[in-house]
């Protein structure tokens, strides 16, 4: 009797344990079908003595490490000043973050910003960081500018833990002088992209006004066909002419057909983003046009393609403050500057031809953002909020507002 009782208890416990495992797996599946939006601060103002963190960028390595980076504005909130580039790494999909790394600039210090109208004799401005994950080599190429006048690249081959010495690549911008005598150069901001042929492409903007001005400006790309060993200039994608006023701060992504879609900020009258496409990412750009669904509050935006290998079909995602300026009657003010708030995300199933389901990530103060995705399809958005840079984690169910995607 004792043996039989023990045996029955053992069988009961085993069956109960298996039932718990089954229910746990079932609840996990149910949870995967539910919408997800959660947030964590990554770069709050005041951390490490930094007055303000701005200009976020984000990539996910081939091994799934999340790299978040931005400008660390040491002494002021201004674009010009003592600025470094800081980075944090996440090994759990953006839920927790390792300590801050100061990754640029670690070459010869270059003070006395020649592009600043007044002051700055002892300042070094490191600006506009852009990372690209080379999915053929696993390395991370990282570009940034110095004093809005010179451009450098560094590389990591260990998931962003250590970085190479900087190499200057300013010569890549010289061909643009044939059309515009630029005085200011800037990469991105945000992230670059890699085409199916291995080419690395980074959006850039250049300005040719008076010292201290970021306008008039125009947009193009630089590229590397040898895994970041050498960089060259592409053709101008969005010139400063006609109805396109001072285009700058572009973001690009690949399309389902292997081409490149470029989305550009400007101060043009329609208050809409400028879009153009290219099959190569460097030339043959289509005639720029304003996209009626992409509002322009005069703020950098992010765009990202999630390939059909992750979901059943390709998605393009787009984030920016969904705002335009309006008068007291609610009528749009041409060439107005919308308030930087209401950071929203929308998606496209047709390579950016049309956009659906505008969802609000941050209703309050919010501005620049950058998008990435994890191998399991979780979408990450690193964005500027009120005195902080935050990482939002979300799934496609939340973005589309539909379950079972």
Residue ranges and their predicted role:
Residues 14-26:
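Bacterial N-terminal signal peptides
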Residues 33-405:
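Asp-box/BNR beta-propeller blade signature and adjacent active/binding-site loops
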Residues 29-31:
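Sec/Tat signal peptide C-region and signal peptidase I cleavage site
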Residues 6-9, 24, 324:
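Intrinsically disordered and other compositionally biased segments
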Residues 1-13:
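N-terminal secretory signal peptides that target proteins for export/translocation
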């Amino acid at each position: 009797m004792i043996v039989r009782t023990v045996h029955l208890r053992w069988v009961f416990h085993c069956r109960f344990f298996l039932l718990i495992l089954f229910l746990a797996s079932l609840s996990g599946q149910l949870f995967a079908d539910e919408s997800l939006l959660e947030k964590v601060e990554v770069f709050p103002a005041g951390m490490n003595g930094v007055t303000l963190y701005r200009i976020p960028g984000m990539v996910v390595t081939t091994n799934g490490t999340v790299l978040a980076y931005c400008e660390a504005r040491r002494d002021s909130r201004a674009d010009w000043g003592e600025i470094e580039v800081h980075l944090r790494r996440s090994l759990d999909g953006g839920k927790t973050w390792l300590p801050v790394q100061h990754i640029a600039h670690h070459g010869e210090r270059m003070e006395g910003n020649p592009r600043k109208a007044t002051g700055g004799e002892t300042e070094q401005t490191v600006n506009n960081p852009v990372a690209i994950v080379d999915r053929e080599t696993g390395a991370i190429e990282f570009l940034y500018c110095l004093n809005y006048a010179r451009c450098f690249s560094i590389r990591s081959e260990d998931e962003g833990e250590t970085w190479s010495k900087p190499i200057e690549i300013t010569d890549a911008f010289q061909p643009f002088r044939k059309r515009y005598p630029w005085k200011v150069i800037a990469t991105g901001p945000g992230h670059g992209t890699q085409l199916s042929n291995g080419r690395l492409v980074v959006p850039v903007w250049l300005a040719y006004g008076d010292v201290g001005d970021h306008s008039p400006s125009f947009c193009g790309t630089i590229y590397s066909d040898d895994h970041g060993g050498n960089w060259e200039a592409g053709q101008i994608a969005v010139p400063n002419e006609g109805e396109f006023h001072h285009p700058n701060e572009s973001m690009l992504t690949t399309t389902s057909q292997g081409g490149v879609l470029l989305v550009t900020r400007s101060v043009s009258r329609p208050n809409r983003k400028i879009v153009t496409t290219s099959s190569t990412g460097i030339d043959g750009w289509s005639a720029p046009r304003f996209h009626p669904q992409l509002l322009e509050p005069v703020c950098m935006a992010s765009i990202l393609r999630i390939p059909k290998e992750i979901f059943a079909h390709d998605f393009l995602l787009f984030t920016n403050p969904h705002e335009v300026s309006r008068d007291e009657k609610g009528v749009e003010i041409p060439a107005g500057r919308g308030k930087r708030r209401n950071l929203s995300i929308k998606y496209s199933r047709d390579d950016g031809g049309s956009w659906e389901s505008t969802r609000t990530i941050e209703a309050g103060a919010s501005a620049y953002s950058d998008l990435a995705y994890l191998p399991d399809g979780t979408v990450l958005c690193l964005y500027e909020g009120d005195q902080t840079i935050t990482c939002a984690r979300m799934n496609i169910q939340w973005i589309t507002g539909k379950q079972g995607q």
